[in-house]
Amino acid sequence: MNINPYFLFIDVPIQAAISTTFPYTGVPPYSHGTGTGYTIDTVIRTHEYSNKGKQYISDVTGCVMVDPTNGPLPEDNEPSAYAQLDCVLEALDRMDEEHPGLFQAGSQNAMEALMVTTVDKLTQGRQTFDWTVCRNQPAATALNTTITSFRLNDLNGADKGGLVPFCQDIIDSLDKPEMIFFTVKNIKKKLPAKNRKGFLIKRIPMKVKDRITRVEYIKRALSLNTMTKDAERGKLKRRAIATAGIQIRGFVLVVENLAKNICENLEQSGLPVGGNEKKAKLSNAVAKMLSNCPPGGISMTVTGDNTKWNECLNPRIFLAMTERITRDSPIWFRDFCSIAPVLFSNKIARLGKGFMITSKTKRLKAQIPCPDLFNIPLERYNEETRAKLKKLKPFFNEEGTASLSPGMMMGMFNMLSTVLGVAALGIKNIGNKEYLWDGLQSSDDFALFVNAKDEETCMEGINDFYRTCKLLGINMSKKKSYCNETGMFEFTSMFYRDGFVSNFAMELPSFGVAGVNESADMAIGMTIIKNNMINNGMGPATAQTAIQLFIADYRYTYKCHRGDSKVEGKRMKIIKELWENTKGRDGLLVADGGPNLYNLRNLHIPEIILKYNIMDPEYKGRLLHPQNPFVGHLSIEGIKEADITPAHGPIKKMDYDAVSGTHSWRTKRNRSILNTDQRNMILEEQCYAKCCNLFEACFNSASYRKPVGQHSMLEAMAHRLRMDARLDYESGRMSKEDFEKAMAHLGEIGYM
């Protein structure tokens, strides 16, 4: 059954019809195969924008470095990265004058936050490049392998608990003549094959110690792993994204926190706020511009698009920015903030899996790993790849990586780059001409408002803004930016026309079935519709249609049509039998073939609660029986989070209310993982989970209050248990023998 998404637009006012131009239903495109080509594209493009800069060879890594700052003055129409440092600093000076004390306060707050940040902050985050095994791992695992390897080199800062001592270790590690670390190696064993002649070669993952030289270690620490960005709609070509390693993460975190403190107090910044708060900020900006417009004058808005934002920015500009922002801070904090940009201006991009080539007879395929890209004759590649490799050659290192000193990778310094954009917007006017500009910036997206007495002066203002941005390394695209009278523009996928236009078509892909389990999917579906009514101006008739479409989709997904429907099938047989034997058929869940009772008034109520009072007692008993092996009470208590994928922008986390019943099952993890080197990771995770459960059993508040202190977990638990035992013994809740037994056990642990 194909559902026509246009049903959703029945009661939409005419200007909101923008929604109909986004018929994004269905699965977005995912990337397949190797991402090497996209990464090489990024490396080549980035260097092309900076190619007139100073070139030199790094004395540490031997890589080719390019520094475009203070390069030739930029030209119109060509994107370039030649930011002029004195212009950047002057723009920041003006920002400092306009917001007195903002830089000092932001630095002070960031410094105080850094002092109390613990190492475990680095466990937040998804994939992280792990230098010990040279591939991506979950952030927590990468941090763990780094800390255990650091201990082998007498670097024990992490044990103190704070982020600062751990970061000090990272700096010290870069000076060690060699680094010893644990890695995973596959040992091949020959075993006689059971069912045929000959041998089987079995790979056994082993944890082994290894050592690398200082230069090799520094190269790994500076490496960014690259992948292809998935699920991007509206583009023919995929593009590369990067993942930094643990050494860079801690320093980036502090710089981003500093920039966040500043963005929060800049009225032109679209970060770090979101949703309705961002809309309020936008509406205020529009109102302010219209009220400042000269009598009889004109106010224009440019919906802006920047060409290759990341590739034209430069870490050296960010270094200048952190130095300027932290000007009045203690020297240690200024040094700390300067490390991230310095590491980034020496970064090295890993190129991924390499290319596939076929033999001349087209019979055999072979994967050429990145270190060997230039070891085979170039004519073996197709023309496109050959052209790429020729351009890549000067920046290629023999390990199969590429030197990438200019440019930033996606999503690394969103806040700090926003500060740079806002600095350009804050200049407002050049040479006291008769226009004023202002605007909004959110990472690489911007909207520019210009007020002047007539259209020509407005255009002059826009051109001046364009050239101002050029001096900061920002390239506004003349082709993709367009200008309207103020009152109609788009900023971060929010469309404005005398107020925000309801734009729930963006959310259409997330109106489907989430695929967690029957119980959660129903809750998520209804919550999304509810949220769209609250936040995105979805009207009642539309919402009603959305409910019906969702229920249809849900029934098709889980093959659970109404008990009185004519649909056949294995599951329907069981459902029909249940339907026949049930008195209160309204009480059956939709997943059990019951009717849908959802309407606009009860979207916020979980289905089990909605139908609780009209269920047959025996059905209710089966559905909610705590001893029923399918009722996952422990795993589903209270509020749960789901990942929602809108058509635009990142995956969002969304809370929904969960009530556990027999439909709240959890799928088992894929068993095939048990024979890989990931197995150790799972065992470690289970070990951590047990430790944390033990700790929470001793300290009930640990689940909602972060424990602070310098004790190890073991000492803290032993101490707490001794206290509890003594209290129980003294109050008579515990016998003398039990008390002595408990004390003896605690003594055996070695902490008495």
Curated annotation (Swiss-Prot):
It is an enzyme of class 2 (transferase). It catalyses: RNA(n) + a ribonucleoside 5'-triphosphate = RNA(n+1) + diphosphate. A motif (Nuclear localization signal) lies at residues 187-195, 203-216. Residues 249-256 are annotated as: Promoter-binding site. Its main location: host cell. InterPro entries: RNA-dir_pol_NSvirus (IPR007099), RNA_pol_PB1_influenza (IPR001407). Phosphorylated by host PRKCA. It holds the Pfam family Flu_PB1. It is found in: Host nucleus; Host cytoplasm. GO terms for cellular component: host cell cytoplasm; host cell nucleus. Residues 286-482 form the RdRp catalytic domain. Its EC number is 2.7.7.48. One of its GO terms (biological process) is symbiont-mediated suppression of host mRNA transcription via inhibition of RNA polymerase II activity. Keywords: Eukaryotic host gene expression shutoff by virus, Eukaryotic host transcription shutoff by virus, Host cytoplasm, Host gene expression shutoff by virus, Host nucleus, Host-virus interaction, Inhibition of host RNA polymerase II by virus, Nucleotide-binding, Nucleotidyltransferase, Phosphoprotein, RNA-directed RNA polymerase, Transferase, Viral RNA replication, Viral transcription. The keyword Methyltransferase does not apply. GO terms for molecular function: nucleotide binding; RNA binding; RNA-directed RNA polymerase activity. RNA-dependent RNA polymerase which is responsible for replication and transcription of virus RNA segments. The transcription of viral mRNAs occurs by a unique mechanism called cap-snatching. 5' methylated caps of cellular mRNAs are cleaved after 10-13 nucleotides by PA. In turn, these short capped RNAs are used as primers by PB1 for transcription of viral mRNAs. During virus replication, PB1 initiates RNA synthesis and copy vRNA into complementary RNA (cRNA) which in turn serves as a template for the production of more vRNAs. Influenza RNA polymerase is composed of three subunits: PB1, PB2 and PA. Interacts (via N-terminus) with PA (via C-terminus). Interacts (via C-terminus) with PB2 (via N-terminus); this interaction is essential for transcription initiation. Belongs to the influenza viruses polymerase PB1 family. This is RNA-directed RNA polymerase catalytic subunit. It comes from Influenza B virus (strain B/Lee/1940). The gene is PB1.
